[in-house]
Amino acid sequence: MNTLLMSLIFTTMTYEMPKLPYANNALEPVISQQTIDFHYGKHLQTYVNNLNSLVPGTEYEGKTVEEIVAAAPDGAIFNNAGQVLNHNLYFLQFAPKPSKKEPAGKLGEAIKRDFGSFENFKKEFNAAAVGLFGSGWAWLSVDKNGKLHITKEGNGSNPVRAGLKPLLGFDVWEHSYYLDYQNRRADHVNALWNIIDWDVVEKRM
């Protein structure tokens, strides 16, 4: 298991919550403590609990969450595994005071190559996140050839299903932003850029 991608702990028949590298109120005002308490403490905990109830006795017992998402058909196991994977990547990509405003190194070079500039990338990514109908996720991923892709994933899906490696994900389920932004999804998406820990995202390459 890639520990940089999968920091939730897996033991026999048990999936556990990832440990946040910041306090529940540390991302304010972008994400409030109340949202973290509910989104991380309630929603993600429910997905983890559900997965621990669903997997034992199935062909997915002993598999990592990433392996389950890549192989499972649509259904309860896939939905909960997808949301555990998605939220693990999501919550661990943030920092209260990121060390830089945009990626550098290999990821920064790839963004300029594939999107022209970081600003062009942000515009395309924002359009995907804001334009996704209903609940789901916007992702930046990389394929086996090193090319970057922006994808929209409905509900609990994840780019690993298409053989891609997810690097950066924005949650646009209403539960991720409604307490702070109500129906203003675009404001939520724009604000998230201020707390992205590009050091973490770069290591996922």
Model-identified regions with their sequence ranges:
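Sec-dependent N-terminal signal peptides
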Residues: 2-11
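Feature for soluble, non-membrane regions of globular proteins
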Residues: 12-205
